């Protein structure tokens, strides 16, 4: 038995069950991924014990020379990977990364343009229930009703009318390529700075499969998980002129001591992202997403904007009796994990929704390829045709488990 199993069998059991879920179920939540053993080892290291307020070479505590090494590695690797002037790897999350950027250039009450949450944006892009919507005057933009892609005519009209100090670009549920150059043109017309939140597409950007926002934005934020396949955390890239202000808005502005074990894991993940095989992995994510989208359309599902250019797609259930909530719950019983999601021009509550979101990063990490996407689409279609039949859903789960056992990832942790 392990030390944890001996001392705290309840926690050990929960970890084991979660490992089994990740190993044998089909993980299709677009914002989730599975890290490598090297990342897990770094995050579970003694770096967790060290307080290191401040920045490398300028700490408020002694004994920081080793943690300085890993933070400097993470910074330099991030700059190399994305071609950025400056990187801050201390944010605990993507939300705190966004908060630090806002506080670097905005005052309470300033106007920002951000993507409407129900059109694919994120809570921190100005949702009224979030700090971003409470501190700032938010003008939301969205997608065209005809194409379900970003309506740049609307973005320009709103920018000219409201003269925002910042335009927030990026999304949590947008399946198409984002035209950063078009946003830059609009921002320059009104003297606005741009913050791009590339949390979902950072891995694709790193691999050259999505245009980079770095040349077009004063600030770029990201999480280090999702497509980047690192530990849960945040990161900020910015132009050199903003580096000092940005750093002070992370510490001491909104955070105290950084999580050095997580920063060590970020450094490892960023090294992985610099390897040639990472580009092949990201290409497979996109191939799988396109294959899965095609297979779902063949089976009669309607996808927001008709398909995908990246790692995710949104299934639109408007006009059917199904809700996103029922779809999520039914698929979970079938061993398939997705999340309910609002769709553009949503008519249902965000707790019910008219859609669900699917992403391929985690399944691709397991090793699934285009050939398996037909099976995955079949499982989804069959499960959603049997939402009231628990026995059938359990039978589908058995077949999902058989499929996933062909693609082991953490099986050695269960032996």
Swiss-Prot record:
Recorded GO CC terms: cytoplasm; cytosol
Q: Where does (6S)-5,6,7,8-tetrahydrofolate bind?
A: 117, 121-123, 241, 349-351
Question: What UniProt keywords are attached to this protein's entry?
Answer: Amino-acid biosynthesis, Cytoplasm, One-carbon metabolism, Pyridoxal phosphate, Transferase
Q: Which PROSITE patterns match?
A: SHMT
Locate the site labelled Plays an important role in substrate specificity.
Answer: 225
Annotated pathway: One-carbon metabolism; tetrahydrofolate interconversion; Amino-acid biosynthesis; glycine biosynthesis; glycine from L-serine: step 1/1
- Catalysed reaction equations from the record: (6R)-5,10-methylene-5,6,7,8-tetrahydrofolate + glycine + H2O = (6S)-5,6,7,8-tetrahydrofolate + L-serine
- Output this protein's name: Serine hydroxymethyltransferase
